[in-house]
């Protein structure tokens, strides 16, 4: 595992348990989508992970492809239909692209699967470049709401579940360079 990826996981764990008033007894993070894959797993330009903490589960991002997260979960014998909450880190399609297909497929098994989607306030705002909206996630909002998704907006640090927190909106200091 490369150093950058290890540092990311360490940072994510610090965010999850670092702001807590209690102590997490059981924490597990399972990566379902990343650029690195082998054996029976699919890789893609995207990210998704299940965070499990003391009996609570939340899907952190949904990858970019329609099938990557669900196929990798199936390969790991993970039942995604029992995960009701999704946390979207930001609006890029490599972190949100799988959400519509996950909701469509899993709601037939469990109507609450992937139903509650935690997002930062302003995630659906237009991002204009040369007069065009380049925020692809904006176009997904109506589709997701028609599938029964309820968005939960966060602006400041908040506890989502016991010992699972969001930092809230992280201000952008510099324009994106990629």
Regions found by a protein language model. Give the residues of each.
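Conserved beta-strand hairpin/beta-sheet module of binuclear metal-dependent hydrolase folds
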Residues: 28-75
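Metallo-beta-lactamase
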Residues: 120-178
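Active-site metal-binding motif and surrounding structural segment of the metallo-beta-lactamase
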Residues: 67-118
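Active-site metal-binding loops of divalent metal-dependent hydrolases
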Residues: 34-36, 62-64, 91, 121-123, ...
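Active-site environment of divalent metal-dependent phosphoester hydrolases
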Residues: 38-39, 66-68, 93-96, 124-127, ...
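Bacterial Sec-dependent N-terminal signal peptides
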Residues: 1-24
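N-terminal-biased segments
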Residues: 23-37, 93-101
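Beta-strand-turn-beta hairpins that frame and shape the catalytic cleft
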Residues: 25-27, 53-57, 158-165
């Amino acid at each position: 595992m490369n150093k950058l990826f290890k540092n990311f996981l360490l940072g994510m764990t610090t965010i999850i348990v670092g702001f807590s008033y209690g102590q997490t007894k059981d924490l597990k993070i399972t990566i379902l989508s990343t650029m690195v894959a082998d054996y029976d797993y699919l890789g893609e330009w995207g990210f998704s992970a299940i965070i499990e903490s003391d009996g609570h589960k939340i899907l952190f991002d949904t990858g970019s492809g329609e099938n990557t997260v669900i196929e990798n979960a199936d390969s790991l014998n993970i039942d995604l239909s029992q995960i009701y909450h999704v946390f979207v880190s930001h609006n890029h399609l490599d972190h949100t692209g799988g959400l519509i297909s996950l909701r469509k497929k899993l709601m037939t098994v469990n109507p609450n699967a992937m139903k509650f989607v935690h997002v930062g306030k302003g995630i659906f705002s237009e991002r204009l470049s040369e007069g065009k909206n380049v925020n692809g996630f904006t176009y997904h909002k109506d589709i997701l709401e028609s599938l029964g998704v309820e968005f939960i907006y966060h602006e400041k640090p908040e506890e989502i579940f016991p010992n699972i927190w969001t930092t809230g909106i992280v201000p952008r200091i510099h324009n994106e360079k990629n």
